[in-house]
Amino acid sequence: KRFRENETFENVIQPTREEVVNNFSLKGKKALVVGARRNMGKAFALGLAEAGADVAITDINIESGQLHKVSNEIEAMDRKSIALKADISCGDDVKKLVKTVVEEFGTIDILMNVAVMYHPKSVVDLDEDSWEKLTNVNLKGYWLMIQEVSPIMIQQNSGSIINLTSRGGLKAHADKAMGNYAIIKSGIAMMTRQYCRYLGPHNIRVNAIAPSLVEWEEFPGEENRKKKNKTVKREKKEVTEAEKFESWLTGPENIPLGRVATFDEMANAAVFLASDASSYITGTILNVDGGYMA
């Protein structure tokens, strides 16, 4: 029987405004954001906190004080927060990190893997040591985090895991220097899909966010947002089509919306995937890319 007594089709399918708002709320949830010191990681942590979650944050660099500043911003919202140093490529560090968060928060409802390491060398010129460093953080680290946190979520029969992949993980790059990044990000995309299969029966959703161009703290996106198709003016030599396609300066010209994404726009996607608003979404690579992959 589809309807309960006194219910009609209209009042079943039309939620109230309060119900819609509550679906996006993270009030009472406990989140762990990995790689939250700056840029997108910081934005994700603050976004989850604004939606109501208590947020633990971690980074390999804690000495600069930036991570503690993010934690202070979260606490200023009347949320709980702790800032912890961890090398997620090290299994012992990951175990200690998760244990500390659970001791402080009681559980982990949301895991966001955002940590990233770049290397300027082309994939064809990369040496074995550099490749190992890249994969240890960008791939092994994500795997270690999921392996350590998922048993907690299995025990409580709920959870949301969100990985950061990229447009680079979804199509090959003309720019050789992006090759190693693309290979690793494609691995994260498949890791997301595989864990969706394994953890779905335990009511744990596993998704990924795939941005295209996103503002940096050094290059804010607000002006770009207001002025479509405007780029930084500076002298430059004539570029090839491949360089034009991949360049930070001209890249927005190849995005239908004509601009880079702001941190707030990225955070909105994270809140959606972490919340009950996406309760039937798992195994998805969410392109937050201004139409780049269209």
Give each language-model segment a name.
Residues 3-22, 259, 270-271, 282-294:
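Short C-terminal tail/terminal secondary-structure segment
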Residues 24-56:
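Canonical Rossmann dinucleotide-binding motif of NAD(H)/NADP(H)-dependent dehydrogenases/reductases
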Residues 122-123, 130-135, 251:
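Substrate-binding pocket helix/loop in short-chain dehydrogenase/reductase
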Residues 146, 184, 192:
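Active-site helix of classical SDR
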Residues 151, 197-198, 279:
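Alpha-helical segment proximal to the catalytic Tyr-Lys
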Residues 166:
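Residue(s) in the substrate-gating loop at a strand-loop-helix junction
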Residues 200, 205, 281-283:
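Short, small/polar-rich loop/turn modules that mediate ligand/substrate recognition or access, typified
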